[in-house]
UniProtKB/Swiss-Prot annotation:
Domain VOC: 1-129
Family the UniProt entry places it in: Belongs to the bleomycin resistance protein family.
Name of the molecule in the record: Bleomycin resistance protein
InterPro entries reported for this sequence: Bleomycin-R, Glyas_Bleomycin-R_OHBP_Dase, Glyas_Fos-R_dOase_dom, VOC
Organism of origin: Staphylococcus aureus
PROSITE patterns per UniProt: VOC
Pfam families registered for this protein in UniProt: Glyoxalase (PF00903)
GO terms classed as biological process: response to antibiotic
C-alpha cells in the first residue's frame, strides 16, 4: 500500500470547499458535480456531496440507495500528520472551528494533537509525533 486519501461526505460541496481552502489552507485541484479534490502540501482530501433527500420518501426498509443520502454528511473523520502543530493550533484557534472538547495536548501514544470540525461535523484531527 502506498497512501490513504480520506473521502469526506459533505452537505454542500461549495461551502465545504470554501472551509477547507479558507480555514485550513487547502487548494482546490479538481471540482466537478458533487466531487472535489483538495491538496495542502502532500495531503490530499476528497469531498463528495451527500445531499440526496430521496431517502425520506423511500418505502423500502433500507434508506441507503445512492450512497449520497443527506444523513451521511458529517459522519466521517480523518487524521492529518503535521509539523509545527503548536503554530497550526495558534493559527486555527481564533477561527472558531475547534472541536468543543479539544485542546492541544500530548497523548500517551507519543502524539500531540487537536481536532476541528468542518461545517457538516466531520472530525479532522491534526497530530505531530513527539518524543517521550
Amino acid at each position: 500500500m502506498l497512501q490513504s486519501i480520506p473521502a469526506l461526505p459533505v452537505g454542500d460541496i461549495k461551502k465545504s470547499i470554501g472551509f477547507y481552502c479558507d480555514k485550513l489552507g487547502f487548494t482546490l485541484v479538481h471540482h466537478e458535480d458533487g466531487f472535489a479534490v483538495l491538496m495542502c502540501n502532500e495531503v490530499r482530501i476528497h469531498l463528495w456531496e451527500a445531499s440526496d433527500e430521496g431517502w425520506r420518501s423511500r418505502s423500502n426498509d433500507s434508506p441507503v440507495c445512492t450512497g449520497a443520502e443527506s444523513f451521511i454528511a458529517g459522519t466521517a473523520s480523518c487524521r492529518i500528520e503535521v509539523e509545527g502543530i503548536d503554530e497550526l493550533y495558534q493559527h486555527i484557534k481564533p477561527l472558531g472551528i475547534l472541536h468543543p472538547n479539544t485542546s492541544l495536548k500530548d497523548q500517551w501514544w507519543d502524539e500531540r494533537d487537536f481536532a476541528v470540525i468542518d461545517p457538516d461535523n466531520n472530525l479532522i484531527s491534526f497530530f505531530q509525533q513527539i518524543k517521550s
